């Protein structure tokens, strides 16, 4: 335990001992185990994972990485990049506390600032509101409602930026059904199985590409989200988990047009 107040405790980089905040009710599930292993490996590359507990119950977490090692498709060398932030108990300012901790780490480490990829259309990426409250500003947009927000510690520093070849990235997967996945999120194993189940009902065999490192992610990812994508005949179906039925419906519509 790093520090505590009377009721709120901070646990840093103890995911093996304290567990993952997400999917904690399914700790024997393959995705959960893969997340633990992935996170511990990324600790050696500068990843930070902080979990908050209130009265010994998990109430939120934040995960962030060095820009050079971030699992988001954004050029952010010299910055810290927030992967995820989630608060289960609102109204206590816990989310802002976690963001401010990340900013303080950026100062301590001599970084240019903090960057985060947001999206207003899904809960699988954070929304921008809490970052605006904490002094972040919007710098760039990408397809599928992704946006880049930054907190810059020195205005003379260059801004992070998105790649500019999103269409080309999708064109690489112009034939068949492709799943790009990582183990950064514990739900992605379930998401993958849902696609496979849906594909079987339509008579399609998906190709699964496991993204092993940042360089591969930066080369292949068709959105800033980076860690999970389903692409069918060059068209993005999803970058997050969906039910098998929803995937099957989309696949049927796409193949009926071809």
Language model features: what each stretch is:
Residues 232-258:
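Non-catalytic, surface beta->alpha helical segment in thiol-disulfide oxidoreductase systems
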């Amino acid at each position: 335990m790093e520090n505590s107040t009377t009721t709120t405790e901070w646990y840093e980089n103890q995911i093996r001992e304290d567990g993952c905040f997400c999917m904690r009710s399914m700790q024997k599930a393959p995705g959960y185990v893969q997340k633990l292993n992935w996170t511990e490996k990324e600790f050696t590359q500068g990843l930070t994972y902080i979990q908050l507990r209130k009265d010994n119950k998990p109430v939120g977490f934040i995960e962030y990485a060095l820009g050079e090692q971030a699992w988001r498709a954004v050029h952010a060398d010299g910055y810290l990049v927030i992967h995820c932030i989630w608060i289960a108990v609102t109204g206590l300012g816990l989310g802002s506390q976690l963001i401010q901790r990340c900013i303080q780490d950026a100062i301590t480490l001599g970084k240019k600032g903090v960057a985060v990829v947001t999206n207003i259309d899904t809960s699988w990426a954070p929304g921008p509101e809490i970052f605006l409250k904490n002094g972040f500003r919007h710098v760039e947009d990408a397809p599928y409602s992704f946006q880049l927000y930054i907190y810059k510690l020195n205005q003379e520093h260059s801004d992070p930026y998105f790649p500019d070849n999103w269409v080309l990235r999708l064109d690489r997967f112009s034939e068949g059904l492709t799943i790009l996945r990582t183990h950064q999120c514990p739900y992605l194993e379930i998401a993958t199985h849902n696609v496979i189940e849906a594909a079987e009902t339509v008579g399609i065999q998906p190709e699964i590409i496991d993204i092993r490192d940042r360089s591969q992610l930066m080369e292949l990812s068709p959105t800033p989200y980076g860690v999970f994508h389903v692409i069918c005949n060059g068209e993005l179906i999803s970058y997050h988990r969906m039910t098998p039925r929803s995937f099957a419906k989309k696949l049927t519509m796409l193949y009926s047009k071809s």
